[in-house]
């Protein structure tokens, strides 16, 4: 059956696209622990995707059968590149395309992309239209923020007029980054806007939600269709499980997950990806138990997967 946001059971829980974190390896770990309803890739630059020698860029679009349904998130400023990228993505088995209009990173915003598009609605509309034209009827969504400097519901209203299949809103402005609590008090007004302007657009809220149980409360309070969980999975790989008993892991369970992550990384990427970026995941698994800090320090000193395995095995045998 063709994927449709509207056919998903409510509330919908999605895994956020997070740069340098939610690659296919980590998504598969989450899928085996407690799967979300929808997965997103890391954001992929449209011009990079179309360039020759795009191996590193296309790695971002790698996924497995267990990561379904999966949405390809793309970003950039050139509308023709969005059109061509959408054509390419439509042949790759993805269930939808999401346009990043929310990343607050300074160098990207300076180029007028991602959150920079909040200040350029004409280009934002052109990009949405071109992506839709190239996508061969794949669902189109946008992930954005409440505004650039201040909360701007006119921006949300504008997006709701673009006939999107889904709109994911990080409930902070670009200026706020993640430095203040998310503005969940705005969600009800946004739901009312959606009901008035575009009743068929699915609304997903994002910001400060650690797990499904917190998300259920937010949905109850706001009337949103679903919740996107991001950093919560770094604290708890079982963030998408409603079973609270699964959120408390033993030391052996945590370290077994790390070993699984190492094995999967090696199997999927081999020599394609270097070892150092893998170290950012150590803190996810090596925390909250006696001598965790010392173990993490030793792991950070390793230079390859085999060395990391040796350190882990020594710790578990001690």
Stretch-by-stretch model annotation:
Residues 1-318:
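Flavin-dependent oxidoreductase catalytic cores
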